[in-house]
């Protein structure tokens, strides 16, 4: 109940407008794979091409060794969950879940076994006689997921399935979806624009922009060593600063120097762009004045962490995230000195098109960098 999905040189266009150009991708059997990117990047278009709902202008799509370009969507054995749930309002929970099995002429005995199994798996068995209007958004999404999985598809496709839920329920549902996917082991392709959601559920993520894959890898790799500046700014928060590179010495904010021993492209020198995550700054408690000099503009207390908004001597604005202290918050106008571990800094070419450091793990086939 799982397949490898392979895409070779896919193209999708609407008239003269190219949505996806020469995209290749290899999704592993049983993998939870997420297409992540801003609106209009082509992620839903690609998902619909896999499903058979959009035409394929060029390229080949495979489930294992079987080419599916011309295969009717109904014969691809996919389960699909949409943003708007798409469950039938006139049917009970149980009737919604059994719908696909009835269409496949499954025997009543087998149908009952499978329906009971998935109602329990989704923790909605106590609601089996309820109509959808009497369910919460999370419960309706569980019904949609049960209906998609009960037919034992080879692939599960999910298009922004949590976007209509409130923040707390989204966290609960993404945890449930990941647990269910792990227990079943089905190849899952998930579309979202929410980077935190993507990192929480995915085995691997393809970060997309303008129909191209910018970075493909595990969430940790993408967050810690993004392939280019777009990926760095799209995945989580980061501070983007100007820098100057001379050999292994990186100068930040005009004065602060860091010695780097992990430069891969040693031909790069002069102006570069630097990315530092807010949580990677360390405020020098001893005020030794050998760090980056900054001035606190404001702060926001968020329980576990306090977010400080500050500016450097260069005038560049930054955000600093520190673990909250019981006794104090740094006041507005205070002068602080910041340090950062050299391995926590990312350095990009001046145009932001690529990371020049070692340790960038990018599985993208025919990698296209930001222009």
UniProtKB/Swiss-Prot annotation:
One of its GO terms (biological process) is transmembrane transport. ATP binds at residues 37-44. Its main location: membrane. GO terms for molecular function: ABC-type ferric iron transporter activity; ATP binding; ATP hydrolysis activity; transmembrane transporter activity. It is an enzyme of class 7 (translocase). The keyword Nuclease does not apply. The keyword ATP-binding applies. It holds the Pfam family TOBE_2. It is a peripheral membrane protein. It is found in: Cell inner membrane. GO terms for cellular component: ATP-binding cassette (ABC) transporter complex; plasma membrane. It comes from the Bacteria. Part of the ABC transporter complex FbpABC involved in Fe(3+) ions import. Responsible for energy coupling to the transport system. PANTHER family: SPERMIDINE/PUTRESCINE IMPORT ATP-BINDING PROTEIN POTA, SPERMIDINE_PUTRESCINE IMPORT ATP-BINDING PROTEIN POTA. The complex is composed of two ATP-binding proteins (FbpC), two transmembrane proteins (FbpB) and a solute-binding protein (FbpA). This is Fe(3+) ions import ATP-binding protein FbpC. It comes from Fusobacterium nucleatum subsp. nucleatum (strain ATCC 25586 / DSM 15643 / BCRC 10681 / CIP 101130 / JCM 8532 / KCTC 2640 / LMG 13131 / VPI 4355).
């Amino acid at each position: 109940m799982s397949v490898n999905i392979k895409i070779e040189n896919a193209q999708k266009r609407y008239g003269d407008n190219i949505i996806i150009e020469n995209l290749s991708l290899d999704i592993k059997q049983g993998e939870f794979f997420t297409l992540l990117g801003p609106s209009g990047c082509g992620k839903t278009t690609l998902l619909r091409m896999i499903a058979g709902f959009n035409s394929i202008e060029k390229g080949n799509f495979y489930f294992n060794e079987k080419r599916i370009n011309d295969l009717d969507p109904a014969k691809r054995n996919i389960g699909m969950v949409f943003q708007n749930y798409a469950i039938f309002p006139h049917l009970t929970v149980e009737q919604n879940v059994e719908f696909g099995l009835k269409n496949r002429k499954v025997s009543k005995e087998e149908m009952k076994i499978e329906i009971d199994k998935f109602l329990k798996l989704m923790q909605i068995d106590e609601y089996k006689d309820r109509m959808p209007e009497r369910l919460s958004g999370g419960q309706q999404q569980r019904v949609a997921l049960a209906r998609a999985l009960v037919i034992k598809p080879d692939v599960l496709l999910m298009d922004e399935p949590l976007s209509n839920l409130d923040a707390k329920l989204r966290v609960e549902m993404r945890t449930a979806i990941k647990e269910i996917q792990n227990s079943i082991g089905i190849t899952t392709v998930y579309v979202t624009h929410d980077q935190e959601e993507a990192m929480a559920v995915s085995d691997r993520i393809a970060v997309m922009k303008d129909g191209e894959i910018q970075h493909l890898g595990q969430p940790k790799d993408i967050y810690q060593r993004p392939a280019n500046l777009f990926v760095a700014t799209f995945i989580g928060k980061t501070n983007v600063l100007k820098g100057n590179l001379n050999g292994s010495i990186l100068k930040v904010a005009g004065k602060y120097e860091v010695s780097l021993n992990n430069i891969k492209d040693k031909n790069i020198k002069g102006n570069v762009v630097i990315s530092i995550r807010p949580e990677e700054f360390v405020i020098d408690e001893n005020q030794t004045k050998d760090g980056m000099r900054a001035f606190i503009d404001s702060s926001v207390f968020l329980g576990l962490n306090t977010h400080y908004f500050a500016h450097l001597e260069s005038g560049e604005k930054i955000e600093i995230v520190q673990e909250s202290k019981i006794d104090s918050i740094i006041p507005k106008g205070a002068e602080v000195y910041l340090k950062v571990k050299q391995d926590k800094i990312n350095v990009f070419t001046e145009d932001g098109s690529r990371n020049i450091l070692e340790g960038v793990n990018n599985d993208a086939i025919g990698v296209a960098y930001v222009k």
